[in-house]
Amino acid sequence: MTYANIILPLPLEGYFTYGVPDALASRVTAGVRVSVPLGKSKTYVGIVADYPVNIPNPSENDVAGGKKITYKNIIDVLDNSPVLLPQQLKLWHWISDYYMSPIGDVYKAALPSGLKEEYGYRPRTELYIRLADNLRHERTLSLMIDSMKRAAKQVEVLMAYLQLAGVDEMAEITPKTVLREVTREELMNVTHASVGVIRALQDRKILITYEKEVGRLNSGKPSHPENIKPLNEAQTEAYNQILLQMMSHRVTLLHGVTSSGKTEIYIHLIQKALNEHKQVLYLLPEIALTVQITERLKAVFGDRLGIYHSKYSDAERVEIWRKQLSDSPYDVILGARSAIFLPFHRLGLVIIDEEHEQSFKQQDPAPRYHARSAAIVLAQMYPNAKTLLGTATPSMESYYNAKQGKYGLVELTRRYKDIQLPEIEIVDIKDLYRRKMMTGPFSPRLLSAVREALGRGEQAILFQNRRGFAPMVECRQCGWVPKCPDCDVSLTYHKNMNYLSCHYCGYTMKVPEACPCCESEDIRGRGYGTEKIEDEIRYIFPEARIARMDLDTTRTRNAYERLINDFSTGKSNLLIGTQMISKGLDFDKVSVVVILNADSMLNYPDFRAYEQSFMMMSQVSGRAGRKGRQGLVILQTKSPELPVIQQVVRNDYQSFYSDLLTERLEFHYPPFYRLVYVYLKHRDENTVNSAGLELGSRLREIFSDRVLGPDKPAVARVKTLNIRKIMLKLENGIDYSRVRQYLRGALEAVLKDKRYGALQVYYDVDPL
């Protein structure tokens, strides 16, 4: 008997060891799926991590707690070849180790659901029609047709089939004639015949039906490298500099201003990689971005391009996965965060566009990995594979690494076709509110700028980083605010459906007709979400063709495409949206962009608030002004004097970076220190408090003043669980493997206390 270590999709540390029956041993290898028993009645699909593994004298010596260990056997091997390549298994282990997450959680995040179940994936099949073999002679077929004179419809269908199959004359039919494959649906569409007519031809043994597997993936058109646009002088210089930097660096940062034409540089780099017979992974932070970029890449790379993200059906994702394992994989994969888990045989280039984006960081559930970091590690597993980070607003960590020489650095400071950067106009709404000159959240300057743009046949974008109709509703008599019963947050009002919802757990309730505290009916929304902005702007501009892009309006793949296509083609001319509209979308007719409230981002209680606000405002501003016209950005704020606001206006990333770097060094934050958050959750607040204090005390014994907390996070209760957070600030260069060891040891010591049996603990490494 041999033994194998198996990864199961369970949030438990380590592997499960199973016996491998001799009859299955030849089919077991690392990366194949196996069916295994667990407990008394459950069966799971696991992944073989190691085979064979040494078990010393399993029949005699394995004893735990006085009980002999018995090993269950694998039930079956589900694959003829591995569904995971060696590089993928290495990436799984790195993510599990670095982000302190059980490898079973990595399994759950990485594999499409259809591969996690023994019978989860069903290939799509279609019914085809063919002529019976004995009728593939002119005389035999003619006699058969003559005998069917009373079945005119059947004769019509048979003749239509022959025509579709490529037979122009009966004399052409021989047993060696190659007939075109015809689907039953195609034949029915051409002849308008019923299934009954075709079934009658089957009963006569004239036509034979057979089932054939057909893919769900669009085959696409052949690639057209000639569609690659030539680079201008600035782009060519940047392209050459990137190649030069890649000779001495595995990772290069392209810092290019908005609308500088970074995508065209990417396309040239992709083509170079393909010419060298290498594969390319192109990562984007938002699914919305893939809609626009897909069309550009398809025009060049055609059927060599595959797209992979969560809006595709599970069956489609399984088929892409299997295609990547085949001998004819996609050469270019365009995808969001989860695309890092796909198999690649010959990966040569990874492009991470908008590398600064928070969307690259997985939050819940585990593993809480950063796709940028994981993609860099993935590329390093392939010989000479390079990573290119691209953005107009680099993250502090990436720019610091580039400045320190760890990454290559290329700057692209000119916009494509020398389009001017937009004029950014600050509007002090604090003064306007005091003088009662605001119309809701809209300043007079905002309204006049939008009115003028629409009057010229141009488009405008309004940015408000909060979805829903209003952040909360409130009783104007007693101040009652409806809160989620399970979370420590107020409910958000959604007017279109007339309900209140919790954006943390999904709890919903109808808006009460009267206040439950004082019975007043004067219940109104407070604040402005995108839905309310849309409502009020329709009243002010009734002639405008308004679209809204937020999580509520883009829950399906087609919703993204429809909204973006409608705005691109002019069906809508005023787009209201949350942060997803800031992420690299290009619209030629947008001349005005409005940031409705910069302060809501700046005042968030997080050390990254200014960094994220600068990036968000700069990226949103970059949507204004494209071909032949300088754009205008209206930036509404109550704090126009803040340095970060002035830096956005001047498009002064260097000054922003320098100021923030000094602050980060002083207060021990990234890029000089690494952060690890330890979260504790429990239904009982006293229990989570005491557990947090005990764990914090044990960690302070090891890490001293590097430990902060436990504290309550901004939202201290979610889904009935009370939350506490402990922060570790660790110097760069510290032995991180020992840190993990100490963390786990301290936690194990705390969990020995029976009071903490139901305590949930997880880590967030490099949190955002």
Give each language-model segment a name.
Residues 33-34, 91-94, 675-676, 680, ...:
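Hydrophobic/aromatic-rich, well-ordered segments within soluble, folded domains that form packed cores
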Residues 226-232, 236, 248-689, 697, ...:
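Inter-lobe coupling/hinge segments of SF2-like helicase ATPases
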Residues 1-391, 405-419, 702, 736-768:
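Accessory, non-ATPase domains that flank or precede helicase/AAA+ motor cores in DNA-metabolism machines
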Residues 9, 21, 681-683, 729-731:
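Solvent-exposed residues in well-ordered beta-strands and their adjoining turns
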Residues 50-52, 111, 211-213, 464-466, ...:
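A general secondary-structure junction signal
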